[in-house]
């Protein structure tokens, strides 16, 4: 074999590389062994995962339930459930056997009592008394046992009822301190409706009584000069009805229809469909005085104040429309005006007659 002939530094380098290579091979072998061990640990036996049906520890009922391959968790769960059933059966069997033993002991006691020798009548009486006492004691014992069983059953029933009550959903109740006036309430709405109807009826009845009241009106037939008259009529009388009755007082107007007559109050021409009640209710005023007063009086004052409205009331005028058309450019008919289309606006301070209010202000 040929030898490498070189410098000492090259030889050292070769030896270092060989050692490094050996170390790497060792590390690779260690990793391979570690992987093999991990694979072995992850592999489970079929007996660990499943258990055969022919296991001697399981009973016949569990063998019937575990047909075929069953996971070990299911297998153990089935065994636990079966053991619980067996325990409950054993407890019931013990109770029954105890009851049977007690009954047998009672029967044996009765037999012993009957087999006792009867030496005298007193002994018989005593024996009968003892037998009766024993029987009573035995009956009391049976009754006590039955009562205890009934108590246990009742306690179990009460526990079940309490559990059911706890499982029920608890709903929140209403808070009586909360204001619920904004919520719809049929009863409250019906009461409010009845109250409104009652108040409306009372108001209408009151207005009808006011309309039926009589008052005196001073008027004149105006044809350039006044022919004054006075008449009594109800407050609900319309202007048309008043003109129909008033024209009969004058010979000149007996042949004139109501449609050709005009009614003027305080320089305002009032339509025929209005009533005196409307004029009084509106508290309106005309150009020279109030429209709701139909008597005649003058407001005489020592000091005239232009800021305070006068209380003078003038007589109403009844005029033929033909005369008005001919003389409407002459005083006083030149001052007359038709009532506005909106009628008596009580919110209009220019038309509303408020003497007392203005006196209070000034």
Swiss-Prot record:
Biased composition (Acidic residues): 122-147
UniProt feature coiled coil, ranges: none
Record GO biological process: chromatin organization
Biased composition (Low complexity): 83-93
Domain of life: Eukaryota
GO cellular component, one term: nucleus
Residue ranges, annotated region (Disordered): 80-103, 118-174
Pfam families linked to this entry: XAP5 (PF04921)
Protein family membership: Belongs to the FAM50 family.
Protein name: Protein FAM50 homolog
Species whose genome carries this gene: Dictyostelium discoideum (Social amoeba)
Taxonomic lineage from the root: Eukaryota, Amoebozoa, Evosea, Eumycetozoa, Dictyostelia
């Amino acid at each position: 074999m040929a030898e490498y002939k070189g410098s000492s530094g090259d030889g050292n380098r070769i030896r270092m590389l060989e050692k490094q290579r050996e170390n790497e091979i060792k590390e690779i072998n260690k990793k391979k062994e570690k992987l093999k061990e991990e694979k072995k640990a992850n592999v489970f036996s079929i007996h660990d995962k499943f258990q055969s049906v022919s296991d001697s520890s399981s009973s016949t009922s569990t063998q019937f339930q575990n047909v075929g391959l069953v996971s070990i968790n299911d297998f153990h769960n089935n065994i636990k459930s079966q053991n619980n059933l067996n325990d409950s059966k054993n407890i019931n069997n013990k109770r029954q056997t105890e009851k049977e033993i007690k009954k047998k002991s009672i029967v044996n006691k009765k037999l012993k009592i009957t087999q006792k020798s009867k030496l005298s009548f007193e002994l018989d009486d005593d024996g009968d008394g003892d037998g009766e006492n024993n029987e009573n004691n035995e009956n009391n014992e049976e009754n006590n046992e039955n009562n205890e069983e009934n108590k246990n059953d009742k306690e179990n029933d009460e526990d079940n009822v309490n559990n059911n009550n706890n499982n029920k959903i608890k709903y929140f109740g209403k808070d009586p301190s909360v204001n619920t006036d904004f919520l719809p309430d049929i009863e409250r709405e019906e009461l409010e409706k009845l109250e409104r109807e009652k108040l409306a009826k009372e108001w209408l009845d009151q207005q009808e009584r006011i309309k039926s009241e009589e008052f005196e009106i001073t008027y004149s037939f105006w044809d350039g000069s006044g022919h004054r008259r006075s008449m009594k009529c109800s407050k609900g009388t319309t202007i048309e009805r008043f003109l129909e009755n008033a024209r009969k007082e004058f010979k000149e107007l007996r042949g004139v229809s109501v449609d050709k007559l005009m009614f003027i109050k305080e320089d305002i021409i009032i339509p025929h469909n209005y009533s005196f009640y409307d004029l009084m209710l509106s508290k309106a005023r005309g150009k020279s005085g109030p429209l709701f007063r139909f008597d005649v009086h003058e407001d005489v004052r020592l000091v005239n104040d232009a800021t305070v409205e006068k209380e003078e009331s003038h007589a109403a005028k009844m005029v033929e429309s033909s005369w008005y058309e001919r003389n409407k450019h002459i005083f006083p008919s030149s001052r007359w005006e038709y009532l506005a289309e909106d009628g008596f606006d009580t919110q209009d301070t220019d038309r509303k007659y408020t003497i007392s209010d203005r006196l209070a202000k000034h």
